[in-house]
Amino acid sequence: MKNKKNFLVIGNPIKHSLSPLLHNYWFHKNKINCEYKKLKTTQAEIKKILTKVRKKEIEGINVTIPFKNSIIRHLDILKGDALKTSSVNTVYLNKKKLVGENTDVYGFSCGVIKKVANRIKTAGIIGAGGVTSSIILALIQKGVKKIYITNRTFSKLKIFKKKFKKIIYPIKWNDRYKLFRDVQILINVTSLGMLGQKDLKFDFSIFDKKINVVDIIYNPENTRFLKDARKNGHKTF
């Protein structure tokens, strides 16, 4: 078929991504002449991929781990929440400029946060990856006043403290159980538990069952993290 428009999601790993299945279903259902593929990518290959976007060989790309931050140096313009988070998951060409946007904030707000926002004032985050700043911004926009965040490499948390100031409370990995007791929602933003990755092991037995537990991983749908939370009586998303 002539003039087919091509779209792509890039990442590493990328096997877990269901984006092509979702997008191609709607393209076919609505008789839109487009195709969406996934590509395992290295940092060195990103510039070459973006050159294809500039040439309109690729109409646009989605970006997943671990490139949501590092791709920014290759772009001309950041818009909306991408400016606030320094995290990009969508790239396209507009007036000969490569534009980076962030739909992660909106997606998380419309999904999980919308269901629990009225009663959430304190949150805990596990992980310091490319989507972390998007989750933080979504929480702030919904009125969360205090966010504890932990990561095995403590130094990686400094960037979030610098960007979001007093609302962020970085905590050392060994202190996570003690300080997370005060949160109302606990969110895993690491890749642990993803298809092909190691599980995230977490002891929920010391936590109040009223704490909502979230895992941003969607493949598999039921991660070890969520299963363990449900065993302890937590509501999971």
Give the positions of each predicted feature.
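Rossmann-like NAD(P)-binding element
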Residues: 153, 178-199, 214
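Conserved beta-strand positions in the Rossmann-like core of class I SAM-dependent methyltransferases
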Residues: 37, 147-148, 237
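Short, conserved loop/helix-junction motifs that constitute active-site signature segments
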Residues: 3, 118-119, 141, 202-211
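Phosphate/diphosphate ligand-binding glycine-rich loop within oxidoreductases
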Residues: 2-115, 228
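Rossmann-fold NAD(P)-binding glycine/threonine-rich loop
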Residues: 203, 211-237
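Glycine-rich adenosine-cofactor-binding loop
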Residues: 11, 102, 112, 116-144, ...
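Short acidic low-complexity segments
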Residues: 167-183
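Helix N-cap at the beta1-alpha1 junction of Rossmann-like dinucleotide-binding domains, i.e.
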Residues: 14-15, 154-155, 220
